[in-house]
Regions:
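Short strand-edge motifs at loop-to-beta-strand transitions and within beta-strands
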Residues: 375-379
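Beta-strand signatures of extracellular beta-sandwich domains
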Residues: 351-355
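Short beta-strand elements
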Residues: 399-414
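A short beta-turn/strand-edge loop motif at beta-sheet boundaries
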Residues: 340-349
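A domain-level signal for the mature, folded cores of soluble proteins
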Residues: 1-136, 148-318
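Short, compositionally biased P/S/T/A/G/V-rich stretches that sit at domain boundaries
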Residues: 311-328, 338-340
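Surface-exposed loop/edge segments in extracytoplasmic proteins
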Residues: 360-369, 400
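Beta-strand-rich modules
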Residues: 385-396
Length: 414
């Protein structure tokens, strides 16, 4: 099916969105949001090249710990995202009588097609902290099947706070898109207006508005997946610590990337990282099962593996000028490491990083050297200024133990 045919099918069955009379936002283009955003690596470090954020998202597309900082606002300014500046920067001049923009995706499964309408909101201003975050992705999914020479909608699935709810389409309405009611602030989608049970009640009272269909654009999926659809980070800053409340403690950082998943809080992941809704729309609609583990299950397993294998003992490491032993130049050093740990926690190699202390107080990296416990190696490390080194031991699973503090090479024997 060509892109034009996909858009035609998406337009025909596009949902009619009904918004609460007090709703301030409509789903919009991602471009305006990314144009004013920086990308953070973890909680603080700003990745280079931002804003705009899109280039950094492509470069760091596998960084699960990254998060968008909309408009570069201060991490502690919880009220900033409600300010006039953010509204104007995002393009608040949008027509609130309309239904905004939806990003479409068509997934063929047998003789049926699953039409996905991804809706992006720049803000999720819930009352309680666990639900308060920047950036918000919502999904409306419609299954259409061939009927004679055309198509007919047979079921609709809405992601109500991530939990899919599927309803069949009445026979009299199979040739059109469904009506969807959007809750104020949370933007969760429902089949009926009124109050709906949630952490706090979700409410949608359109006050007699007839609703409207969103404009449509296909999700910009690149062949090499270097796009914001597949970016592994989160679409906003943690405002309320919702993930920590739900999942619990985070262990020490390790080379296992899954131990850092969800660290940015409860802001959403990109569409391609939202589990079975992307991976298997049929399963998301309740038509089957998927055997792949969920992100949370993988994270918990990684935590257990990390806790069971993390080498808590620092190895004994010595660095001394090689001239003590063989009379070679002072820029050649012997590195010797002792054994540490046991079983899976046993240190299998030691990595030593060397730095040159410059006159202005900064340091210049000179590279890494590796040695095995119980062995010694001789390495050439040219330098002019004072030499500083630090070391850390790694086990067989490449998990790093407690690092050895910064030290200087032992004095040369007289």
């Amino acid at each position: 099916m060509s892109p034009d045919e996909q858009l035609e099918l998406l337009r025909r069955f596009a949902p009619t969105l009904h918004f609460d009379a007090l709703e301030r936002w409509r789903p919009g283009l991602v471009d305006g949001y990314l144009e004013h955003s920086t990308v953070l690596d973890g909680d603080k470090h700003v990745l280079p090249g931002t804003p705009p954020a899109e280039a950094a998202m492509r470069e760091h597309r596998h960084n699960y710990n990254a998060q968008l900082n909309p408009l570069g606002n201060d991490l502690n300014l919880n009220t900033y995202r409600r300010s006039t500046e953010m509204l104007e920067s995002y393009g608040r001049e949008q027509d609130l009588a309309g239904a905004g923009i939806a990003y479409g995706r068509v997934v063929p499964v047998g003789r049926a097609f699953f039409l996905q309408y991804w809706l992006f909101y720049p803000d999720n201003p819930c009352v309680l902290p666990p639900g308060r975050h920047d950036g918000d992705w919502e999904l409306v999914q419609i299954k259409v099947e061939r009927e004679g020479e055309g198509f007919a909608a047979t079921q609709v699935t809405l992601a109500e706070h991530g939990k899919p709810a599927t309803h069949p389409v009445e026979a009299s309405r199979r040739g059109e898109g469904p009506s969807v009611f959007v809750a104020v602030d949370s933007h969760a989608c429902y089949f009926k207006q009124g109050a709906h049970p949630a952490l706090l009640s979700d409410v949608c009272d359109p006050a007699g508005e007839r609703g409207a269909k969103p404009a449509l654009a296909l999700l910009p999926i690149a062949p090499d997946k270097r796009d914001w659809v597949h970016w592994a980070g989160r679409w906003g800053l943690d405002r309320g610590g919702g993930t920590r409340l739900a999942i619990g403690l985070h262990l020490k950082p390790t080379p296992w990337p899954l131990t850092e998943l969800n660290k940015a809080g409860d802001s959403p992941k990109s569409p391609a990282h939202q589990g079975k809704s992307w991976r298997s729309p049929r399963v998301f609609a309740g038509e089957g099962t998927v055997r792949k583990w969920s992100t949370v299950q993988l994270q918990r397993l990684a935590h257990l593996i990390g806790y069971a294998t993390w080498p808590k003992t620092s190895p004994r490491v010595e660095v001394r000028p090689a001239a003590e032993v063989s009379g070679t130049a002072a820029s050649t050093y012997v590195i010797e490491a002792g054994s540490a740990g046991h079983f899976l926690r046993r240190v299998t190699f030691v990595s030593v990083a060397f730095f040159e202390q410059l006159p202005d107080g900064t340091r210049r990296g000179l590279g890494l050297q590796r040695v095995r416990p119980g062995q010694a190696g001789t390495f050439g490390i040219p330098h002019e200024g004072e030499l500083v080194w630090r070391a850390a031991g790694y086990n067989v699973l490449r998990q790093r133990g407690n690092p050895v503090p910064d030290r200087h090479p032992q004095a040369q024997a007289q």
